[in-house]
Amino acid sequence: MCHFNELSIEIESKNLRSAKKIFHCPYEECGKKYSRPSLLEQHLRTHSNERPFVCDYTGCSKAFYRKSHLKIHKRCHTNVKPFSCHYDGCDAQFYTQQHLERHIEVHRKPKPYACTWEGCDECFSKHQQLRSHISACHTHLLPYPCTYQDCELRFATKQKLQNHVNRAHEKIISYSCPHESCVGHEGFEKWSQLQNHIREAHVPSCSICGRQFKTAAHLRHHVVLHQTTLEERKTYHCPMEGCKKSFTRSSALKKHISVIHEGNMAFHCDSCGTKFGYKHMLQRHLERGTCKKAHKPYINECGIKHDGIEGVAIHDQKEKELSSNLVSDVAKKIINEVTGHGYKEAREYSCSFPECNYRFKRLYDMHRHLNSHH
């Protein structure tokens, strides 16, 4: 009865783990499913060939699906091998646990082929390994020559010869472009070459509005904007009592709490000392020229205060220009507002959504429009 209960518990535990895997891979013929969105996102990179984790060592541009894989790779640059073989007389060390386990299997295999040279106790599981050992360690013969013209190198094993040929004489196409519409490229030797090609020739773009993005991940986040309303995307609610604010990103919620509820003002004007919670508010303050410096102001003939003597001179010049052009400027402004003339020229940033004609002078204003209206 005890064994039956243990078996029932184990089966039930497996069923619970399986039931929690509610995030399915959307690709056809792929039945993978995961318990967390982050795991599904990692898996999707194997379909899209997206490797966002790139080695930053000079001269190395290898990229990986996961951050943990990049961490392991960097050990080859620092030569850190934390996994050591525990067999007596074996000092082998490895970068990963998997490589160590693969090496240990070599120790466990039967080794019927023993070296007969005097003083040598080496044994091998394959006869070819024994022959290579004798050539490399005892006779120092290199029986495998390179057959390419003008190449006189020789090697102790077939594998070393093949590695040399692949590296020095033959272009091995290891990576092909996954885009079906890509023509004119046979393939690439290195993963980094393929990634550079994809970034330049296949820029991720939205099929709905045409907007382009640096990575496929940014595009996936953008597509959600078309599929859901703004209120549906605001899933991060402020927990403070009496505050009904909600946000589309956790970072925006954290910033809101820090500024509005905790009063953290990280940005300040160097001239007047005014503090702001957001960088764009400081930028707006500087652009509008409303900054009041702490030093004693200069007063011109009109009785208007200025931050410096230069301000007085500029003001006087503007007064002269204004007196001569006031009527024409006012008339032009009224005409522009009525006719819409000059609206497009003054606003270089346009909304990328179809049937939306809003335009903006600043990129920041356009982003605020996208978040609040689309």
UniProtKB/Swiss-Prot annotation:
Q: Where are the zinc fingers (C2H2-type)?
A: 23-47, 53-77, 83-107, 113-138, 144-169, 204-226, 236-261, 267-291, 349-374
Q: Name one Pfam family in it.
A: zf-C2H2
Q: Name one GO biological process term.
A: transcription initiation at RNA polymerase III promoter
Keywords, in A-Z order: DNA-binding, Metal-binding, Nucleus, Repeat, RNA-binding, Transcription, Transcription regulation, Zinc, Zinc-finger
Q: InterPro entries, per this entry? A: Zinc_finger_trans_reg (IPR051061), Znf_C2H2_sf (IPR036236), Znf_C2H2_type (IPR013087)
- List cystine links: none
Where is this protein localized, as stated in its record? Nucleus
User: Record's PROSITE patterns?
Assistant: ZINC_FINGER_C2H2_1, ZINC_FINGER_C2H2_2
Principal location class: nucleus
Checking SUPFAM superfamilies in the record gives: beta-beta-alpha zinc fingers
* Record-level GO cellular component terms: cytosol; nucleus
GO molecular function annotations of the record: 5S rRNA binding; DNA binding; RNA polymerase III general transcription initiation factor activity; zinc ion binding
- Regions crossing the membrane: none
Q: What does this protein do?
A: Is required for correct transcription of 5S RNA genes by RNA polymerase III. Also binds the transcribed 5S RNA's. Initiates transcription of the 5S ribosomal RNA gene.
Name of the protein this chain belongs to: Transcription factor IIIA
Q: Which organism is it from?
A: Schizosaccharomyces pombe (strain 972 / ATCC 24843) (Fission yeast)
